[in-house]
Amino acid sequence: MRTEADFAIIGGGIVGLSVAHGLLKQGCSVICIDGSDTDFRASRGNFGLVWVQGKGIRAPFYAAWTQNAARIYPDFVSELSQETGVQINYNQAGGYEYFTDPQTLSQRMDEYKQLKKALNGDYPYEFLSSSQIRAAEPMIGGETIGASFYPYDGHLNPLQLLKALASYCQKKGLSHYLGEELKTADKKEGVFRIVTKKGLTISANKVVISAGLGAKKIGPLFGFLGLVSPQRGQILVTEKISPILNRPSVTIRQVDEGAIQIGDSQEQAGFNDNETQAQMSRIARNAIKVMPKLAQLRLVRAWGSLRVMSPDGLPIYHQSHIMPGAFLITCHSGITLAATHSTNLSLWLTGHKNAPELSRFSEDRFHA
């Protein structure tokens, strides 16, 4: 495998491989320096949503970025499947957020009204009454009083997406080094030199840090603040059954193989990714309020995983002031943003004339 390239990407999860996919399509040579299988990897614990609604309520530019990502997703997935032969079970028929509390529902209505205004009307949501949602989803009932619906929301199998991205990148010449840990990094005469603890030496014209929670340690080597922290989420999985849900919600979805996934937790637990009885019980209770049928199903699996969170919850896209040519990319929506990371963010990395303007996502916002 090569040790010199146009780009060295540090971190080979969904974010890193999505970026690599876009760079390779532009004709760049790319090396990926990846950690071990025991590292914390949000890509493997992902809920599988490609989701817009609820994001960017207080940051309309992020809502617009996410909405664009969802709109280009069908073409992204279709092309990736054709190029690799890997089936990606992706469904974009819209999605729901269910409400059991009138005050929360009213607040969400006001928030979406303001967000739609900020986006000049380009935010095609709607709210459904309890009778409307029951007509659309007969299994939804219990204490559900209504739901929001957004047409570009959807879901997929995240492991299939990860496999397809890895397959494409390998096919197009990605040099992927596994089980590596950075030791030193410097830049001389316009070229980055990265040395790992195993002695691997990589030279690259540009560097992309997409190492998830590893950015906290790796980022400062390139002059970044590396302000990321873990947030634990827990997921419950039922036995496989025949299809009973037409569309996913932000907390309940039926996967392509028939099981129902339930997830509804945001916990500050440090780097502890274990599941807990208290949270699993709470998640199950809340889900049954919305979908009583769940009480009749057997739970067969559960897991915890760590999200990658910035201080304000928004992505960070930043070029180092100290070492220009080094870029930090981090977000907690790597699945949702995969299409735009490949298609648009890669243009920003190469300095293309059609690159998006991303200054509001930079680390500079944390200095204010």
Task: Show which residues each predicted segment covers.
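C-terminal catalytic lobe of FAD-dependent flavoproteins
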Residues: 291-368
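Helix-loop-beta segment of a Rossmann-like dinucleotide-binding subdomain
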Residues: 86-99, 124-172, 265-269, 324-331
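Active-site substrate-recognition segment that forms the wall
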Residues: 21-26, 35, 48-50, 85-91, ...
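Helical element adjacent to the flavin cofactor pocket in flavoenzyme catalytic cores
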Residues: 148-198, 202-205
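Dinucleotide-binding Rossmann-like beta1-alpha1 core, especially the glycine-rich loop
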Residues: 48-132, 136, 286-288
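N-terminal Rossmann-like FAD-binding beta1-loop-alpha1 element of flavoenzymes
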Residues: 5-32
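Glycine-rich, N-terminal phosphate-binding loop of Rossmann-like dinucleotide-binding domains
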Residues: 12, 54, 211-212
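Conserved Rossmann-like nucleotide-cofactor binding loop
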Residues: 15, 38, 214
